[in-house]
Amino acid sequence: LLDKWKTEKTHRSWGWWSVIESYGKTCKIKELVVNPKSSLSWQRHEFRSEVWFVRKGTATIYYSYDKEGVKNVFKTTKVEKQTQRISRYQWHCLANETNKELSIIEIQFGDDCRESDIIRKQLPRGDYLFSD
């Protein structure tokens, strides 16, 4: 498993991600590294759920159970060795609001763990750090 950790990185404006292991189309394990003062977009998934394990750093997670993702936005903070579950269809955003790198192990599971199932939305509030 650790040999696969050295796979190719996909770079984004917020940092990078790499697939550690893939088990068909229904389960995938990735590492996400989020740069300081950066975040992923406000998004949800059609076909999968996720569990995030904080490997290094402090994660700030915004989420909403609202179908449209614009009401009742909650915020939680997770530190090393803590986890957060993101349910299928749940609006969410992973942010690194610190000055140190954030590393997350993401376990995706569901009917289809493909990147194209991401649905992004305009920000529900203007004070988030979101990027693509």
Predicted feature locations:
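Short acidic-glycine-tyrosine-enriched beta hairpin
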Residues: 65-92
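Double-stranded beta-helix
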Residues: 1-6, 12, 93-132
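Glycine- and acidic-residue-biased ligand/ion/polar-headgroup-sensing regions
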Residues: 47-67
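Conserved hydrophobic/aromatic beta-strand scaffold that supports enzyme active sites
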Residues: 29-33, 51, 75, 83-85, ...
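A short glycine-rich, His/Asp/Glu-containing loop-to-beta-strand
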Residues: 3-49, 107
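Structural motif
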Residues: 39, 51, 58-60, 91, ...
